[in-house]
Structures are given as structure tokens and as C-alpha cells.
Amino acid sequence: NQIATRELRDIFGASIFTSPKPLKYLTRYLQIGLNKDSLVLDFFSGSATTAHAVMKLNAEDGGNRKFIMVQLPEKTDEKSEAYKAGYKNICEIGKERIRRAGRKINEELEVKNEKLDIGFRVLKLDSSNMEDVYYTPQEFELQSLFNENVKADRTNEDLLFQVMLDLGIELS
């Protein structure tokens, strides 16, 4: 779609995605099909047009819609404009679009909306934060209770999210 390609070029300054969805039409579909507090799920988010449309619609009508974008980190072609611009996979393009679109929406607002949420959190599917530690009763010693069982590259936030998920607590 030429309109969608032009919209993305305006945001990034280059044609970095081959088949974006048109923002205008997606915004209209969401406006018709959702209420102001809906949750939108896009399992093939690509360049994150859906997230852009949700933020735009919230800015226009004061809604409180949320979005979940899901995208496999498909690598960008090394000869592509996206790769040359530093985007090694599609997820990076989507995240940057959400950042840029959010800033642009905020700048274009005639009256600042303090309640407008343009932030987002990135969650990645990964292995457990805990080391695989197995003891048989014969091997167990009380001193082993003090051993560090958290993988070295994990953050406190990683641990928090794992515990929340294990306990069935919602992440937002």
C-alpha cells in the first residue's frame, strides 16, 4: 500500500518496511470495533501500525485502550534500508515506531492530555531465571541453601516478572 509506505517513510525518513498496514484504515476499524477501554492484540504486529493506531485513537477521543503486539524477531535483510538504519530484526522496527509515533502524537496535541499513555514494555520469551539445580537427598547439605541459583545475566525485574507469572498475577 503506497499510503502506508509513505506514512512509515515520514516516521523513519526511509522506506524500512515492505508491507505496512495503512494507519488511516486501521484507526477507523479500531474506532468502529472497540470501546474506549478495549485491549487490542496483534499477533503479527510487523511495524506496529496497530499500536500506532491505538495511541492515535486514544489521543483523539480520550480513550484508554491498551495494546499487546506480538512479533517473532525475524531478521531484516542485510541489504535492506532497515538493516542499514540499524534495525537487525522486525521487532526493533516496531519498537522504534511506537516510540516515534508516541512522540509525534504528543507533539501534535493541541491540548496536552496528561492521561495519554504512550509508554510500552517489551517482554521476551526466555528460559527460567533460575539455574537448573537438582539435589538428591544424599547430596543435599544445608549449606547449599545459600548457593546463588539465579542466572548471572538476569535482572531484578526479570525475577519479579517470573514470580508474578508463576503466581498468576497480571503484569499490568
Regions found by a protein language model. Give the residues of each.
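Class I S-adenosyl-L-methionine
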Residues: 1-39, 61, 72-77, 113
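A phosphate-binding catalytic loop at a beta-strand-loop-alpha-helix junction
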Residues: 38-57
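Catalytic or ion-translocation cores adjacent to nucleophile or general acid/base/metal-coordination motifs
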Residues: 61-80, 87, 92
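Short, basic, low-complexity termini and linkers enriched in Ser/Thr/Gly/Pro
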Residues: 107-118
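A conserved beta-strand->alpha-helix junction
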Residues: 118-131
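Secondary-structure transition/capping motifs at alpha-helix termini
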Residues: 32-38, 56-65, 104-109
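Phosphate/diphosphate-binding loops
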Residues: 91-109
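Conserved helicase/translocase motor-coupling segment
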Residues: 166-172
